[in-house]
Amino acid sequence: MRGYDDSVVKHRKKKRKLSSGFFYLLLVLSGILFLYTFYKMPMFPLKWTIIVGAVLLVILLITGFFTVKLRPTNLFQKTVNLLLAVVLCATGILLPYEESKITALFESVTGTTTLIHVYAMSDTYKTAHPDYFNDDNTIWTDGASGKQILQDYSDYLIYGTVVKVDRDNQNYCINQLNNMCHTIIQTLDHSSLENAVKDLYVNTTDVLIMSDTYAKVIEDIPGYETFGSDTVILDSFEREIESDFNLIGSSDVADQPFIVFFGGNDQTGSLSLQGRTDVDMLVAVNPKSGQIAIINLPRDSYIPNPDYDGSYDKLTHLGITGLDNTLRGISNLIGTEMKNYVLVNFDTFQTIIGALGGITLDNPYEFTAMDGQHYAEGTIDLDPNQALMYVRERYSLPGGDFDRNMHQQLVMQGIIRKITSPEGIIHFNDILDNVKDCILTNVSSRSIYSLVAKQLDEDIDWNIVKYHVEGEMGMEECASAPGQLLSVVYPYDSQIQFVSGVIDDVFAGEIMTQQQLPEGSFE
């Protein structure tokens, strides 16, 4: 009797094999999951959801027909149903993952930090200048810990400061040093960076407190070009910097005009909202009319600095006290409020170009850069190093700094072309992985999604006009670097008024045509 019962059990087990109908049910459930996920993705317009839903319905009808007509045990039909179910499930899971990466890229940064360094002259420099440095008046580092030196000699060190120039960072560092050394440090304040650095070089002060954003300013001063190699950093303090501007969170950007500042600061390493801007580009966009205006301002434009009570300064220097200050200064200059930004620096710019696999652009003339790199006239391909030099070079260009602004616009076009090319779309996932942490922005992912959805829905044929403002060269004292004459550009009033009008026209929905900038003149 037991043998008979065993055969019955085996027979019943065979009957319980999964049929093609079961796999079809999995396919239907996977299709519903996928369609719901696709519908919830903010970058896809409703029209695309309807199209995808229609295609999916056709697939389900065809597979359903063969599932009914063929035997339930048909291996081919079961395999087809299973494979389609797996593909739909995997895609339904992958879409939210990709969305989360984009969201992280555009929303992970709302503020950043700045570094304040404590500088001292290097032992090598001290040894080479015995007139100022000797064993009786000098503290030698001899490879010792910088922090230990500051603590051990806290009663003797004189700290050079420039509170007038960089109040918040200077006071923050002084307080940190007081706490670290358990004493009130001795300071000698200066009216200008140049005077503070001079006293460090001649041993009037032992150390200098200065934000790293000012190091490039110092190296622009004649006689201090080697400041970076002449000094050592004994210690550094990190201070949190918060932007006054919130994320652009509204989906209204798909229907309302907006303007974004694209800046490139001249620092290496990690990004910071404090630093000089080598690139000062305004991009005005009207999604309804499909108009874009790209406007470059000379980095050395001599304009009022809001953080110095409107005293005149280089545009590039406004960012030293924070990008918010740059945006306020530009807003006052062009008469349109600037509150949205995208910021990169030298290192992150190269990372972005590398992630794209280089870019292609149309170079209007042949030139050789100061580092020896040659750029032919016509269509050229640029790797990350070549692209960086292309947007930085100015001395070997016919129009100097003004032609550099044009180069920056050409590179921006090259980036846009590469991102929207088939190759860029295929490698979009790799690009996202590589450019993470390469930008600082207050543009939210919701804004990006709404623009992408509008582009996919309407296939907008964008009309782009480009202008780079020019001016006359001169030498002036700057608010952020008092006591020294620096090279500046007086931007032409006539051209500032013209580009301000262009921005107004974009916002008004006018159809733009590329025009010549008016002749330069001042009011």
Labelled PLM ranges:
Residues 1-16:
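Terminal targeting segments of Actinobacterial cell-envelope proteins
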Residues 103-212, 216-523:
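Non-catalytic, solvent-exposed segments at the cell envelope interface
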